[in-house]
């Protein structure tokens, strides 16, 4: 029985060693780096292996307990027959063979699964590396595009600020010119009003002088008109051409008046006064 027990322990150790060898290539870091689909398949395979290992450990535990119980029963009952012990040993050996065959089948299934999974894992790792490289290139392109966009936005902003500054300067210059033009126009209007006022005053003054000259000429005759004519440039300070225009009608009127005086001489007693037609009519009536 000791040999059988040592054989069972040796077989259990071998099973544990094989399971450890099968599970050793895959670690937590590799699991974390695998894609979700491959990782799910690997987890399912791992669960199958864990179940198989648990069932094998249960069998080993059952065999150990069985051997312990057999040893205890033999110690308590030393009179048990040797045939019964051999029969039980043969049954245990048969069970062990069945368990070993089942274990081999499961090991083959697991090995085949791993053989099929390893190429997929390698392919997934290659795809992962390609995706990482593509992601790096995409990030680099994105960074370059963002940099170009930032430079373009900054340049556009500077151009807009410069354009707005030029517009502000042009608007200020236009406003200054408009203000100056309005002030100049207002000044010209004021000067025009002043000139119109002065022209009106000069016109009134000229009319008064003309009336005064006509009255003097009518009252005192040509000699007084000549004296008044000599005083006109001093009082009016008019140009010669305007003075000639003013005096020519007066001279014509003087000649006409002298002709009428020659035709109608004044009385002797009234030599100091100018002759008036109304006065002559008054004498005739008296």
Swiss-Prot record:
Residues 230-286 are annotated as: Disordered. Keywords: Cell cycle, Cell division, Centromere, Chromosome, Coiled coil, Kinetochore, Mitosis, Nucleus. The keyword Cell division applies. GO terms for biological process: cell division; establishment of localization in cell; homologous chromosome orientation in meiotic metaphase I; mitotic sister chromatid segregation; mitotic spindle assembly checkpoint signaling; regulation of meiosis I spindle assembly checkpoint. Residues 85-211 form a coiled coil. GO terms for cellular component: cytosol; dendrite; kinetochore; Knl1/Spc105 complex; nuclear body. Residues 244-255 have a biased composition (Low complexity). Its main location: nucleus. Acts as a component of the outer kinetochore KNL1 complex that serves as a docking point for spindle assembly checkpoint components and mediates microtubule-kinetochore interactions. Kinetochores, consisting of a centromere-associated inner segment and a microtubule-contacting outer segment, play a crucial role in chromosome segregation by mediating the physical connection between centromeric DNA and spindle microtubules. PANTHER family: ZW10 INTERACTOR, ZW10 INTERACTOR ZWINT. This is Outer kinetochore KNL1 complex subunit ZWINT. It comes from Bos taurus.
């Amino acid at each position: 029985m000791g040999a059988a027990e040592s054989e069972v322990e040796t077989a259990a150790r071998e099973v544990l060693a094989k399971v450890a060898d099968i599970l050793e290539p895959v670690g937590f870091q590799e699991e974390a780096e695998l894609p979700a689909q491959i990782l799910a398949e690997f987890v399912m395979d791992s669960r199958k292996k864990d179940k198989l290992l648990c069932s094998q450990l249960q069998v080993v535990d059952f065999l150990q307990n069985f051997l312990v119980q057999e040893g205890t029963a033999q110690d308590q009952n030393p009179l048990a027959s040797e045939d019964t012990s051999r029969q039980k040993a043969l049954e245990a050996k048969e069970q062990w063979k069945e368990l070993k065959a089942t274990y081999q089948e499961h090991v083959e299934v697991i090995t085949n699964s791993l053989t099929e999974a390893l190429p997929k894992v390698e392919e997934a790792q290659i795809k992962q590396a390609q995706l990482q490289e593509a992601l790096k290139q995409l990030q680099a392109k994105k960074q370059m595009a963002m940099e170009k966009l930032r430079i373009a936005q900054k340049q556009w902003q500077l151009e807009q600020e410069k354009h707005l500054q030029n517009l502000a300067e042009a608007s200020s210059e236009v406003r200054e010119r408009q203000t100056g033009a309005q002030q100049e126009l207002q000044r010209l209007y004021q000067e025009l009003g002043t000139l119109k006022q002065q022209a009106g005053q000069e016109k009134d003054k000229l009319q008064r002088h003309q009336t005064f000259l006509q009255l003097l000429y009518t009252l005192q005759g040509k000699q007084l008109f000549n004296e008044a004519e000599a005083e006109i440039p001093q009082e009016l300070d008019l140009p010669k051409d305007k003075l000639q225009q003013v005096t020519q009608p007066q001279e014509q009127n003087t000649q006409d008046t002298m002709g009428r005086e020659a035709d109608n001489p004044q009385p002797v007693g009234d030599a100091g006064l100018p002759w008036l037609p109304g006065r002559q009519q008054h004498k005739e009536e008296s």
